[in-house]
C-alpha cells in the first residue's frame, strides 16, 4: 500500500466513545515513519541529524503520534505514564494487544489498530 | 501506608504477572490462535461469544424460577414479565444485546463468529427455550426496556432519550424482528404526581406549585456533598425502575452492572456506609406497595453481567458492532468517592485482572451479623436497627456538645463559621423522626458533612421535597406554622408513630 519504504500506512479505528476526543471521527487513515526517534518525539523526523537514536515504529510511538497529531482534547483521558490510560483497550489486527506485546509490537504497513474506551460504563 | 492513589506505586508492592498464561493458543478449542485475554486466559474470537453468553446465562437463569430447582433442572418459567434497565452505557447496552439474542430471537451470537455463515439459523436444538416470537416462553408478556434520563439533575447535560430509543428500536429491524416496549423515564419523575399515579397510590397531599424538575433540583441541592448527590441519583434511578417494573407485573429487573462496575459499587458503597446492604448490591429482591396498598409480588433485581468485566463488554460491543450512546457519569466530581474508586478499580483490572473478580466474590459472601428489622423509606433496602444511636456513639455530631466545650477543643477551620443544625425544632413530637426509618447509608447521604465544605447552598427554602414513594409512606401535609408555606411536617398514616418532620432532617446545614 505504501509507495515509500520510509513510511507506513495504518488504519486507526476508535470505539466506545473514545472517538469523541478525536474530532468525533471513528475511522482514520494515517501515515507514520517506519523508523522513529527513540524518545517518541513525533515532531522531528529521523532525517534530522540532531536525533541519531532511532528504533522501528511500534505501538508506543503510534500512541504518541495519535496524541500529538490527532487528539483534539483532554489528553489525560487518553494517555497516562507513556501508555494508554487504564480502561482503554487496544486491538491489533482484531487481536488484543496483550497477546502482541502491547506497546512493543512493531508496526507493519497496513496494520489496523483499534482503540476502545470502556469508560462509558454500564 | 499513606492514602495516596495506590495505582502509582503498585509495582513496588506486587510483581506484575504476565498478561496471559503460556501460549497464545485458545484455551477452549485448543486449536485457533487467541484473539483476546480475559483474566490471564486466552480465547479465540469464535470461543469468545459462547463464553460470554454462558456467563450471562449462568448469572441470570438460576434466579428465573420463583423457587430454586431441586436436583433436576426444570424448564425456565418466570412468574411475571421482564424489565431491562438501559442506561445507554456499555454494560447495559451489551446486556440488552445478550437478552435479545439469547431469549428473543435476535440473530444469534454464533452467527457472528468467523466460522458460522450469517444465514445459519439459531441453534434451536441446543437452545429449545429460545423463541423467535413476540414473547419468550420464559417471561410473560412483552419485555420492556426502561431508560431513565438523568439530564435534569445536571445542567448542560445532553438528553439522550432519542438516541437510546434508536438502540432499542434497532432490534425491531433485525431478522427476525423483535420489538421491546420502550419506556423512557426521567429522574424528575420521582417527584411527578402524574408518573406516581400510574405506578403507586396517592395517599397524601402533594406539595404546591413546584414542578417535578424544580423539586428534583431542590432535593439534590439540599444534599451535603457531591458524593451524596451521586448516591441519591442512583437510588432514584433504581426505584423509578422498580416501581415501573411493579406496574408491569414484572418478576425480574435486569441491570447491566458489569463485574467491574459491581466492584466499584461495592467498594464505594462500603466507603459510604452501605456495608449493611452489600449483599443486595449483587442480588436483591424488592416488594413495593401496589396501587391498592398491598405488597406487590417480589421483583428480583438481577445483574447478569456480574461475572463479565468491562473489557469483555467492550470487545463484545466492538465485534457485534453495537453503538454505545454513552451515559452521564454522575460520580460526584473527580474527587468524589465514586470517581476515585472507579479509577482505582479500572487500573487494578488492567494490571491484576483476577483481583477485581475476587472483590466481587468476597463482597457477595458478606452478610450482616444482625438481621434487618425494616425497610429504609428512601432506598427501600433492608435497614439496620438503631442507626441513630449507633451514629451518635461513633461520630462527632456537634461541636457545641458539652464535653467538647469543656475540653477546650476548637472547631476545625472549615466549621468555624458554621452553626450547628438545631437538634430539635418545634415539632409535635421531637423524638419521632424520619431518621429511624432510614438505613445508615441514606442517613449519611442526607446529613454527612464534607471535609471540603458543603456544595452550593442555593435554596432558601427550609424544607426539601422528597421522592414520592417516601411521601406515600408518610403522609405529607402543609403546616400552618410557617406562613410562607415552606415548612412541611410529616404525619404517618394510622397510629401516628412517625409524626415527624422530614424537614428537620433535610435542613440546610448552614
Ligand atoms: Zn477457541
Ligand atoms: Zn436507604
From Swiss-Prot, chain A:
Q: Give the pathway.
A: tRNA modification; 5-methoxycarbonylmethyl-2-thiouridine-tRNA biosynthesis
GO annotation terms (biological process): protein urmylation; tRNA thio-modification; tRNA wobble uridine modification
Which cysteines form disulfides?
A: none
Transmembrane intervals: none
Q: Where is this protein localized, as stated in its record? A: Cytoplasm
Q: Which InterPro entries match?
A: Beta-grasp_dom_sf, Mopterin_synth/thiamin_S_b, Urm1
Composition bias of kind Polar residues appears in: 33-48
The entry's keywords: Cytoplasm, Isopeptide bond, tRNA processing, Ubl conjugation pathway
Cellular component aspect of the GO annotation: cytosol
Q: So which residues are the signal peptide here? A: none
Cite the location of the cross-link Glycyl lysine isopeptide (Gly-Lys) (interchain with K-? in acceptor proteins) from the record.
Answer: 122
The modified positions for 1-thioglycine read: 122
Annotated region Disordered: the residues are 33-52
PTM note: C-terminal thiocarboxylation occurs in 2 steps, it is first acyl-adenylated (-COAMP) via the hesA/moeB/thiF part of UBA4, then thiocarboxylated (-COSH) via the rhodanese domain of UBA4.
Pfam families, alphabetized: Urm1
Domain of life of the source: Eukaryota
User: What family does this belong to?
Assistant: Belongs to the URM1 family.
**Which purpose does this protein serve, as stated in its record?**
Acts as a sulfur carrier required for 2-thiolation of mcm(5)S(2)U at tRNA wobble positions of cytosolic tRNA(Lys), tRNA(Glu) and tRNA(Gln). Serves as sulfur donor in tRNA 2-thiolation reaction by being thiocarboxylated (-COSH) at its C-terminus by the MOCS3 homolog UBA4. The sulfur is then transferred to tRNA to form 2-thiolation of mcm(5)S(2)U. Prior mcm(5) tRNA modification by the elongator complex is required for 2-thiolation. Also acts as a ubiquitin-like protein (UBL) that is covalently conjugated via an isopeptide bond to lysine residues of target proteins such as AHP1.
Q: What is the protein name for this chain? A: Ubiquitin-related modifier 1
What is the organism of origin for this protein? Laccaria bicolor (strain S238N-H82 / ATCC MYA-4686)
Organism lineage reads as: Eukaryota, Fungi, Dikarya, Basidiomycota, Agaricomycotina
